[in-house]
């Protein structure tokens, strides 16, 4: 088995999908989880206005709507969390995503004050954060807020990780990567677009250039620039297609060096890290 085949198997990626079937699969997955653990009353998700959180948010609200109708349990809710750092550059996209999702509840937590306070406390301890590490601080502060909300609403935190993100480890460890349940896992980027199209999502929300937008020195830096490969390259690779050798090498290097992000903390029983 080639490394490409191993990666595809590990991430559960498929060369092609039926959008309606995958929507149903994700919604039923979320419903089944909530029914298995009836003490869970809410799904909590940060909404950025980008493709992934828009899709995950819509699926969450669909699951909650169906469960309420089927069970009569009105205590179930989906909580969409706005998490700007100061003023969000693509504020209108976020508002458009909220309008599309129609969440039961929308909360806004501006993380800038908390991030700056943490940075100042570290500075006083003799640690000066780089712009890149400050970006990770933002991602972790966002997740901290979501877990606080989940803790106070008997909820779980929903993630947006998918195969095209997981393969490169393009998420912050214990930031946006630290979630309870990931309904998009297995899909690549173009497949996520297919689901949103089937759900009649406004096109600009999934045709915009993806960006983590964590670095102050490089605001709105496109993911594809940071990764050195395009999502079309990554999706082709995940679909088992032949890609240029340099592209495959870049993707596989990302996969191998970020393996620790896709695993729980390393113990004496692990050997994946040994060379």
Swiss-Prot record:
Residues holding deamido-NAD(+): 140, 173, 180, 260-261
Catalysis: reaction(s): deamido-NAD(+) + NH4(+) + ATP = AMP + diphosphate + NAD(+) + H(+)
Gene Ontology molecular function terms on file: ATP binding; glutaminase activity; metal ion binding; NAD+ synthase (glutamine-hydrolyzing) activity; NAD+ synthase activity
Chain residues that bind Mg(2+): 52, 165
KW Coiled coil (keyword) present: no
Domain of life: Bacteria
EC number: 6.3.1.5
A cellular-component GO term for this protein: cytoplasm
Pfam families in the cross-refs: NAD_synthase
Pathway annotation: Cofactor biosynthesis; NAD(+) biosynthesis; NAD(+) from deamido-NAD(+) (ammonia route): step 1/1
SUPFAM superfamilies: Adenine nucleotide alpha hydrolases-like (SSF52402)
Residue positions binding ATP: 46-53, 160, 189, 211
Similarity comment: Belongs to the NAD synthetase family.
NCBIfam families: nadE, PRK00768.1
Summary of the function given for this chain in its UniProt record: Catalyzes the ATP-dependent amidation of deamido-NAD to form NAD. Uses ammonia as a nitrogen source.
Protein name (record): NH(3)-dependent NAD(+) synthetase
């Amino acid at each position: 088995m080639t490394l490409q085949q191993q990666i595809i198997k590990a991430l559960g990626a498929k060369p092609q999908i039926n959008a309606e079937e995958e929507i149903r699969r994700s919604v039923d997955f979320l419903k089944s989880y909530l029914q298995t653990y009836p003490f869970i009353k809410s799904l909590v998700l940060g909404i950025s206005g980008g493709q992934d959180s828009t899709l995950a948010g819509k699926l969450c609200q669909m699951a909650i709507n169906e469960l309420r109708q089927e069970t009569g349990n009105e205590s179930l809710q989906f909580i969409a969390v706005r998490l700007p750092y100061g003023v969000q550059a693509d504020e209108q996209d976020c508002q458009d995503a909220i309008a599309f999702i129609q969440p039961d509840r929308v909360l806004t937590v501006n993380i800038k004050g908390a991030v700056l306070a943490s940075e100042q406390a570290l500075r006083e301890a003799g640690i000066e954060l780089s712009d890149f590490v400050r970006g990770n601080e933002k991602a972790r502060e966002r997740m901290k807020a979501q877990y606080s909300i989940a803790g106070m609403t008997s909820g779980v935190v929903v993630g947006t990780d998918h195969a095209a993100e997981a393969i490169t480890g393009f998420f912050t460890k214990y930031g946006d990567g630290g979630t309870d349940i990931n309904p998009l896992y297995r899909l690549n980027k173009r497949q996520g677009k297919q689901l949103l199209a089937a759900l009649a999502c406004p096109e600009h929300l999934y045709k915009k250039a993806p960006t983590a937008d964590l670095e102050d020195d490089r605001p709105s830096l496109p993911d594809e620039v940071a990764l050195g490969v395009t999502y079309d390259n990554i999706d082709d690779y995940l679909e088992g297609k032949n890609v240029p050798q340099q592209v495959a090498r870049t993707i596989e290097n990302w996969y191998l060096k970020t393996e620790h992000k896709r695993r729980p903390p390393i113990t004496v029983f692990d050997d994946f890290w040994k060379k």
